[in-house]
Amino acid sequence: MKSVVIVGPAYPLRGGLATFNQRLAQQFLVEGWQCELLSFSLQYPSLLFPGKTQYSTDAAPKDLVIHSKINSVNPANWFAVGSWLRKKNVDLVVVRYWIPFMGPALGTILKEVRKNGHTKIVCIADNIIPHEHRPGDNTFTRYFLAQCHAFVTMSEAVMQDLRRFEKTKSALLVRHPLYDNFGAPMPMADARQKLQLSPTDRIALFFGFVRHYKGLDLLLEAMAQPVVQAAHIKLLVAGEFYEDEKPYFEIINKHHLKDRVLLHNHFIPDSEVASYLCAADVVVQPYRSATQSGVTPLAYYFEKPMIVTNVGGLPDLVPDGKVGLVCAPDAVSIGAALVRFYNTGAQQFMPHLRTEKEKYGWH
């Protein structure tokens, strides 16, 4: 039996990376591999983590072996964990890379693993160049990439960034598979009842944690456009703020949007994800910059049309006029796309959405 260890966040850590890694582990098990996950005992020091907590309140995933060993800021730990993983002598290590801060820790662990002369190391690169730049980013990234044998990216934008650092090693571009582990889709009426939302309102959804690059401020300004107000559209914001909330509330107050912006500004646990996606008419990703987004495969799974901006890999994932609408990253364009969506109607997008969804399997 072939063996693999997935290195990256996993339960009890929360968030999209942990969810993806656990789903990937389940797929390896289904396909007959021996699979374990190697996660963090300390992922981010509290000073560097912008949210309220790094830990999940959901039940532990079943049938997964998870080792919470990596301390991201302790070099002695990196060598110890690397030695532990080297001695396991697994056939394959799949490691996630999403932020240069993790480069020294993960790179050192992998450097130790390579000493066994057997284990192949494949990196799933979520980001190579971060959304928010810091000194040392390129050095940390180069150090990490040097320890990997091959790479997988989930957008052309990340592939291009990777090739700026690593021009010769094998790299494969694949689609971000569906998040199909949040439970079955439910009727919109049931989802709205759970969230105490009106069954008849027009509701657009912004889903996920809030940072500047995600453009929630642009979407709020779009909500203030007269054409959007005339269309009686409401915005449901579901996610924790990873930066100061004040500028967003200032926009809401300035444009008198309080009755039309429904703020659920807390982390959405896995057990509630289906309710939010199924309650919405459309999912909006008004990003200023993007490589790919975990929200997109989530919308595909729950068969929700999308409005995305024409940045990074988003237009490749959301064919314009078929599974949703693509617009420029400014308030006027986003507002026009919202109105166009409701004038067109969600049903117009459903046949294409279901066809495109088939391309996003785990096989």
Language model segments and positions:
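Glycosyltransferase donor-sugar binding loop
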Residues: 40-44, 234-249, 266
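Acidic anion/phosphate-binding donor-loop and adjacent secondary structure
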Residues: 134-135, 163-164, 172, 177-194
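Conserved donor-binding/catalytic core segment of Leloir-type glycosyltransferases
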Residues: 198-214, 220-223, 236
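Nucleotide-activated donor-binding/catalytic signature segment of Leloir-type glycosyltransferases, i.e.
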Residues: 246-267, 271-274
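Conserved acidic donor-binding segment of nucleotide-sugar-dependent glycosyltransferases
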Residues: 320-332, 339-346
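A charged, aromatic-enriched C-terminal amphipathic alpha-helix characteristic of glycosyltransferases
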Residues: 347-363
